[in-house]
Amino acid sequence: MTYELGENRYGKSRIRLVKVRRDGPTHDLRDLTVDVALEGDFAAAHVAGDNAKVIATDTMKNTVYALASDDLAGPPEAFGLRVARHFAAYPQVRTASVTIREHGWSRIATPAGPAPDAFLRGGSGTRLATIAASGDATTVEAGVEDLTVLKTTKSAFVGFERDALTTLPEATDRLMATKVTATWAYGPAAGRTGFDFDAAHARAVERLLATFAEHVSPSVQASISPSMT
């Protein structure tokens, strides 16, 4: 029996990375989950049991920690570019993909003001960054997930298919709540030093939320479609 090895990738998922800076009485917290995936010349490991070119997933985890130890001051997209480019530099790697989820924390409010060293998990969704590096080429996508939104009007659902098992009444004005995951791609400028990922992400999320709030929606599906440009 003959067979052909198709496209494949492997990597390390759910690398938990929490970094606290205690430079003074006010502490800063970063909380990331990192996934690394590699594609390339790894066929021998699959068909011949030869691991000579395999980069251990433990190495991936430790590399993320080492790079974060050097510098984790910037946005997740910038850190993802560093990690992806590091692994893309291996000769056997064709494409290195890195996905980062940044979990937001805000300072707990106290009678004396924001706590310098106590935090509350944020409710504004999880920031996403997905980077792919192949040789000198890079692509950068960003986004947000688990962004829970609700509006108390400007939503309807009428004129839908009905049959003997349909019990849902039509509604010309209703509550609408949903959990949003949205992603967008940046142009080539995102791969160059100095691109302001934080500002770009803030603008995209601001526009997404404004569209949800302002759009008079005949359905959840229609709310997904209006242009955000």
Please annotate each region the language model reported.
Residues 1-228:
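N-terminal intrinsically disordered, cationic/polar leader segments
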